[in-house]
Amino acid sequence: MRDPVETYMNLVPMVVEQTNRGERAYDIFSRLLKERIIFVTGPVEDNMSMLVVAQLLFLEADNPKKEISMYINSPGGVVTSGLAIYDTMQFIRPPVATLCTGQAASMGSLLLAAGEKDMRHALPNARIMVHQPSGGFQGQATDIMLHAQEILNLKKRLNEIYVKHTGQTYKAIEDALERDKFLTADMARDFGLVDKVIDKRAEEPAAPKAS
């Protein structure tokens, strides 16, 4: 059976551009990285988190003042992996603009909300879902109690992050995250998870005419 990662990489389109040294081929994601675009796609886990963090740090080193665009289509995943991305977004100097395409659920919604203020967007048919963290553990009773307390600590910390980025009260966040809460793009805007719902790319201003 073929490695699914190898199969996926074989499906990634290659693009060719002309440089002063001749033609150069890139996979499409590397080419978009040159335009300072990062993709957070699929489940949030350690390997994906490591790649996103590395790209954020690389783009900061390339230009510490120019904005980074993060396109999110994720069902969420591991809390600590998501927090690694979140902390790096807050740590680096360039502003990070976020855009939800498809879905931003669980940790995906937190990363969407964590973008720079007034630079958090969703496409019209995007779906956003927020909820409290979940987990399971087997073992000795004392260890189960310790893990349960850790989940409660994470829940409190995640609630505080949502409060910071949405402007909602802690009680409102706690109530909203008590169960899976599904939001349309417009509802996510009203809740403070995004700043604007966009359906078209903003047009570039016309160049001034020569006198």
Swiss-Prot record:
UniProt entry keywords in alphabetical sequence: Cytoplasm, Hydrolase, Protease, Serine protease
Function: Cleaves peptides in various proteins in a process that requires ATP hydrolysis. Has a chymotrypsin-like activity. Plays a major role in the degradation of misfolded proteins.
UniProt cross-references to CDD domains, sorted A to Z: S14_ClpP_2
Entry GO terms, CC: cytoplasm; endopeptidase Clp complex
Catalytic activity: Hydrolysis of proteins to small peptides in the presence of ATP and magnesium. alpha-casein is the usual test substrate. In the absence of ATP, only oligopeptides shorter than five residues are hydrolyzed (such as succinyl-Leu-Tyr-|-NHMec, and Leu-Tyr-Leu-|-Tyr-Trp, in which cleavage of the -Tyr-|-Leu- and -Tyr-|-Trp bonds also occurs)
InterPro entries in alphabetical order: ClpP, ClpP/crotonase-like_dom_sf, ClpP/TepA, ClpP_His_AS
Lineage: Bacteria, Pseudomonadati, Pseudomonadota, Alphaproteobacteria, Hyphomicrobiales
NCBIfam families named among the record's database cross-references: PRK00277.1, PRK12553.1
Catalytic site: S106, H131
Pfam family, one: CLP_protease
Localization of this protein: Cytoplasm
Enzyme class: hydrolase
Similarity field: Belongs to the peptidase S14 family.
Name the record gives this protein: ATP-dependent Clp protease proteolytic subunit
One of the protein's GO biological processes: protein quality control for misfolded or incompletely synthesized proteins
E.C. number: 3.4.21.92
Superkingdom of the organism of origin: Bacteria
Classification via PANTHER family: ATP-DEPENDENT CLP PROTEASE PROTEOLYTIC SUBUNIT
Subunit structure: Fourteen ClpP subunits assemble into 2 heptameric rings which stack back to back to give a disk-like structure with a central cavity, resembling the structure of eukaryotic proteasomes.
GO molecular function terms listed in the Swiss-Prot or TrEMBL record: ATP-dependent peptidase activity; ATPase binding; serine-type endopeptidase activity
